[in-house]
A protein has these predicted regions:
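C-terminal accessory module of base-excision DNA glycosylases/AP lyases that mediates lesion recognition
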Residues: 1-43, 108-187
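Alpha-helical ds-nucleic-acid-binding substructure associated with the helix-hairpin-helix region
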Residues: 30-83
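N-terminal alpha-helical segment
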Residues: 77-80, 94, 145
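Acidic-histidine catalytic/liganding microenvironments
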Residues: 87
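Short hydrophobic alpha-helical segments that form membrane-spanning helices or hydrophobic packing faces
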Residues: 95-100
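Catalytic Zn2+-binding segment of zinc metalloproteases
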Residues: 101-107
């Protein structure tokens, strides 16, 4: 590994071009007010490279989901998920989280824990490629997941709007010795 102490080390002009999360970096660099929780959250997201700048059209689309509905509008759902997944910084589990907080009676978070506890011997490992076909596969997976999750809720007699939380905790308890992907050693 090279360091600044190596004889052949030198800086190049390109080293001065810091393009990491350019819009957020600029906003943070120019912030002159007092720290507050919103600023702390932005700094944390900047550092872990998880800041998602969702455009106003996508936010407007998310807001078209009826907060009080108990029935899924599949066409709108597909459109919303596609827009979210095409946004830099938004991956599959995060997109489902946005939907869950918009209407938990229709949507629940899809993640490794809940997925593995309802699908024996299957691993939740979505591709992060933003191609049209890959996003379509993820949307189909999510729609099927919601259907299957409803069946599990009926079987276990739990309310759907709390299913992701209940099953997350159940997985932590019953699979506490099983590692998750990207957390320590992979399965």
């Amino acid at each position: 590994m090279k360091t600044v102490f190596d004889e052949d080390f030198n800086l190049q002009n390109s080293d001065y071009d810091f393009n990491y999360q350019k819009a957020l970096t600029g906003r943070l660099d120019n912030f002159e007010g007092d720290f507050n929780q919103e600023l702390v959250n932005e700094i944390v997201l900047w550092k872990v490279n998880r800041y998602a700048e969702v455009d106003s059209a996508t936010i407007k689309l998310v807001n078209q989901i009826d907060r009080n509905s108990v029935n899924i509008d599949e066409q709108l759902t597909r459109e919303v998920i596609r827009q979210l997944l095409e946004t830099n910084g938004v991956q599959f589990a995060m997109a489902s989280t946005f939907l869950r907080y918009r209407n938990p009676n229709i949507y629940q978070i899809i993640d490794q824990r809940v997925y593995r506890i309802i699908y024996p011997k299957r691993i939740f490992k979505p591709s992060y490629t933003k191609s049209f076909s890959n996003i379509s596969k993820q949307i189909d997976l999510y729609i099927n997941y919601l259907t299957d999750l409803r069946k599990v809720c009926d079987q276990l007699e739990i309310t759907f709007n709390l299913a992701d939380r209940i099953l997350y905790e159940a997985d932590r308890r019953v699979n506490k010795n099983e590692r998750l992907l990207n957390y320590g050693t992979s399965q």
